[in-house]
Amino acid sequence: MFALLKIASCRCESLLGIAPMKRMLINATHAEEVRVALVTGQRLYDFDLENRTREQKKANIYKGHVTRVEPSLEAVFVEYGAGRQGFLSMREIANTYYKADPRQTTNIRELITEGTELLVQVEKEERGNKGAALSTYISLAGRYLVLMPNNPKGGGISRQISGTVREDLKNMLASLNTPRGMSVIVRTAGIGRSQEELQIDLQHLLDLWAQIQKTATLGPSPMLVHQEAGVVTRAIRDYLRDDVAEILIDNEQAFGEAYNFVKAVMPNQLDKLKTYTLNEPLFAHFGIESQIQTAYEREVKLPAGGSIVIDQTEALVSIDINSAKSTRGHDVEETALNTNLEAAEEIARQLRLRDIGGLVVIDFIDMTKERNQRMVEAKLREATQSDRARIQFGQLSRFGLMEMSRQRLRPSLEEATGYVCPRCHGTGMVRDLRSLSLSIMRKVEEIALRERHGEVQIEVPVEIAAFLLNEKRHSLVYLEQTSGVRVTVLPHPHLETPDVCSKYTRL
């Protein structure tokens, strides 16, 4: 079942003048954290991560019951099995759950009562002191379609599809055998697919919905009815396109999960699945660890010497552009334009890598010419065209500010791998213990597998040393045996995360 891979270094592609290949890289060598990267050649353009030490509920479906009706909020609170009750707005409640006709009364207490059982889907994860946002309008994502099984008015075509292609898909959508009371959305992956392929995908989703309904009858609320797919399956479902040449996976179990999904849903793509077997870590081989690291940093450097500074606040994300040492231009206006154009491209990339959602305000370097302002706006729109999230743009104001909003697809990278810093009382973020420890482990692996002899010494805070020497002891022993490099972990009582010291010695 497993395809063996002999990889010619991707660095050769650019040297030979070959167009860089698009690849999906799945790193699952550490069970605590599974990472998916999409690269063109050696440039990272999208990134997803699943922290398996934290439960993710988004898109899960639960059987819950109403615990409190709040007329002042026009909402109800639902017990669905999590630690905190979920928030369900009235506009997210399907008419089938109402006790009265909503056209005859606006009194929420007459429409729905405490104790009412309902199927809910998590729309937004819990954040801070806010409970999860729920909806009774279920959506099930397939390869080419999204099924809305209890929303007859929710169908249509992805907003990213336009022109004659949109009209063709509308006609094809109308001819699909969609049951009464349901609706279907065609995803961008549905472009160029036959009606037969779309119908097969629809049938798969209908079968899934039937199973969900059956499971919901098996027990009382609250209960989990349907678990959203893990990051491996989800990434292949959402990101695999015809232009992705291969999927490289460095773990046998993850490969098996991917193989089973692809075989069931898109068997014609099986030849793209390959196991990665080289000694060098997968992400290090493609040179993207340092690019991933930029997604954890406040300041990101631009090629010509400028930088962007990203700050998360309670209300919005602010992004500031600095020209710094940038020299791209003969005068101030040209330097500002060139730096802003570089920044626009990097901002679009960082929004995807960090999975930033909500309101974003960008402070571009001031430009006096309106033509240049329109160029920067156009560049940002162009750079975000491949983003799966819905994005809305404002125009550059006279103060050089540009507002935009980005759909929150899942918890941001910062939320998934960080925690509120106990030393700064929440004014900043640091990577959590496991994430930082695994980052150190990957760096040690990279050095050991490259050098093949000598010793790597790392001085780390006590809690990180405890994690490495207990949770990752077998990994360290295996690394020493396979690389011939001695790895010494030294706990330092005066170091605090994220500070570490490392030293390599040739013996």
Residue ranges and their predicted role:
Residues 2-507:
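Single-stranded RNA-binding surfaces
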